[in-house]
Amino acid sequence: MTTVYTLVSWLAILGYWLLIAGVTLRILMKRRAVPSAMAWLLIIYILPLVGIIAYLAVGELHLGKRRAERARAMWPSTAKWLNDLKACKHIFAEENSSVAAPLFKLCERRQGIAGVKGNQLQLMTESDDVMQALIRDIQLARHNIEMVFYIWQPGGMADQVAESLMAAARRGIHCRLMLDSAGSVAFFRSPWPELMRNAGIEVVEALKVNLMRVFLRRMDLRQHRKMIMIDNYIAYTGSMNMVDPRYFKQDAGVGQWIDLMARMEGPIATAMGIIYSCDWEIETGKRILPPPPDVNIMPFEQASGHTIHTIASGPGFPEDLIHQALLTAAYSAREYLIMTTPYFVPSDDLLHAICTAAQRGVDVSIILPRKNDSMLVGWASRAFFTELLAAGVKIYQFEGGLLHTKSVLVDGELSLVGTVNLDMRSLWLNFEITLAIDDKGFGADLAAVQDDYISRSRLLDARLWLKRPLWQRVAERLFYFFSPLL
């Protein structure tokens, strides 16, 4: 009996170490950033079972077999659609400003199409204005409405948008709504999904959270885009979820969420439509390519307007493109660089690009919320402040609520606005969208918004920062070590 017990014990120990060795080898063999690999190895060797389970659940990018097959199957038809779009040469910009040219060339080479011109843009900073404009556009819709959001929170003006969307569906408008399962959990537990489906709206719960499949698909891979397309002519995107700030997370202690949205008219709506169609097919298996370009885009031709490039990320889209776009924007700056983000946990490359810009004389400012709804990210962000301040970067801490805007402005001419946070999750994992806009007029509008944010912020004093308590420094370094996983 003792011999059997000893044998079982040795086999258990051997299996334990083989499991750790196998996962370690898997981490080392995967192409990933060194800090990320080191963080995972530390977790696994400090808390082996917890670390192994966590790694198998969220350590690798698993879209899931069915979705991965759909992603592969959709590309031949999508590529043909893009080739047809290229034939509409009148909508594509032939040249860009000197500051925007490197970024637009990168996007053209990685995504296969150039930036589109002839768009009209309106920058919107008040949630009421956004929802009122959206309700008007929905009421005037004639053909189709497509929406995707990370969060749809019932209550306030969000309910008015829902009512107008159902009214549109009842009068024959083809309405599709895709919402992230985790972000919109309150919506899917409410009566709204059934009410909408009964009205004729196609409602899809994207990337459903299912603990039974935790090792088959990465559960923290989320649909983080915020997009609206109406009649393939009007489009919205930005940082705002479908929530009324007066009803959203009022008990979080961070104040109302402050967002930015762009309302657009022009061929950019069709460019965004192909992104939506890819997301829809990956999630449902149904193909809904936008109308043929030669029919749909011709009415949009305009002699003037903004030049825009869409940058999409996520499984099935060009890998690392948004990260590359941010690096290119930072290295293109000659006069000033202003970045706004609620969550700041940059890659080493992005941190280096930001600091280098400041060290070569560029006026670099980063605007962050003083209070954050994520304690982990809040502390991890602070770990980068010393290096940024030493390089000459100005850090503004916004005090007027949770600043949720994601924006970058380079030399007053190149603007980036969208859904991308400056953290690892947005840069490497989630489905995201960013608009690159080459236009001085829009840049002036964005600069005015950022100036307003700065007026409601406190500039971080480098001397006072160096005098902060020791326990804060220890906490910052602890969270910094795990920042590649946040």
Swiss-Prot record:
One of its GO terms (molecular function) is cardiolipin synthase activity. Seems to be post-translationally processed from a 53-55 kDa form to a 45-46 kDa form. The active site is at H224, K226, D231, H404, K406, D411. Changing S426R: In strain: ECOR 46. The chain crosses the membrane at residues 3-23, 38-58. Keywords: Cell inner membrane, Cell membrane, Lipid biosynthesis, Lipid metabolism, Membrane, Phospholipid biosynthesis, Phospholipid metabolism, Repeat, Transferase, Transmembrane, Transmembrane helix. Its EC number is 2.7.8.-. Optimum pH is 7.0. Residues 219-246, 399-426 form the PLD phosphodiesterase domain. GO terms for biological process: cardiolipin biosynthetic process. Changing G378S: In strain: ECOR 16. Disruption phenotype: Mutants have increased sensitivity to novobiocin. Triple deletion of clsA, clsB and clsC results in a complete lack of cardiolipin, regardless of growth phase or growth conditions. It is a multi-pass membrane protein. GO terms for cellular component: cell pole; membrane; plasma membrane. Changing I113S: In strain: ECOR 60. It catalyses: 2 a 1,2-diacyl-sn-glycero-3-phospho-(1'-sn-glycerol) = a cardiolipin + glycerol. It is found in: Cell inner membrane. It comes from the Bacteria. It holds the Pfam family PLDc_N. All three cardiolipin synthases (ClsA, ClsB and ClsC) contribute to CL synthesis in stationary phase. Only ClsA contributes to synthesis during logarithmic growth phase. HAMAP family: Cardiolipin_synth_ClsA. PANTHER family: CARDIOLIPIN SYNTHASE, PHOSPHOLIPASE D. Catalyzes the reversible phosphatidyl group transfer from one phosphatidylglycerol molecule to another to form cardiolipin (CL) (diphosphatidylglycerol) and glycerol. Belongs to the phospholipase D family. Cardiolipin synthase subfamily. ClsA sub-subfamily. This is Cardiolipin synthase A.
